[in-house]
């Protein structure tokens, strides 16, 4: 019966194949576009403000945006500050 099913089965149309491929491409792009376009500029602005008060290396600041559900986004900011210098009395 398997041989008969093989010859009688319908082959996928090119439209169905194209649709499946397009769905894969869209899913991959959605995964890659998780970072909003304004995030790099936001990081630069935050770094400028921090540098007004403390001298730090730009690599010491990380900014991440995390999706938690459909309507909740969490912005996480980590800043590694240098050790405080002691002021003479």
Curated annotation (Swiss-Prot):
Keywords associated with the record: Cell cycle, Cell division
Similarity-based family: Belongs to the MinE family.
UniProt GO BP: cell division; regulation of division septum assembly
Protein name: Cell division topological specificity factor
Keyword Cell cycle attributed: yes
InterPro entries named among the record's database cross-references: MinE, MinE_sf
Function of the protein: Prevents the cell division inhibition by proteins MinC and MinD at internal division sites while permitting inhibition at polar sites. This ensures cell division at the proper site by restricting the formation of a division septum at the midpoint of the long axis of the cell.
């Amino acid at each position: 019966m398997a041989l008969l099913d093989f010859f009688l089965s319908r082959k996928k149309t090119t439209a169905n194949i194209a649709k499946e491929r397009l769905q894969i491409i869209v899913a991959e792009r959605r995964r890659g576009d998780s970072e909003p376009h304004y995030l790099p500029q936001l990081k630069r602005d935050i770094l400028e403000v921090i540098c007004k008060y403390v001298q730090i290396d730009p690599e010491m600041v990380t900014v991440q945006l995390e999706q938690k559900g459909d309507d909740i986004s969490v912005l996480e900011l980590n800043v590694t500050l240098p050790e405080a210098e002691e002021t003479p009395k």
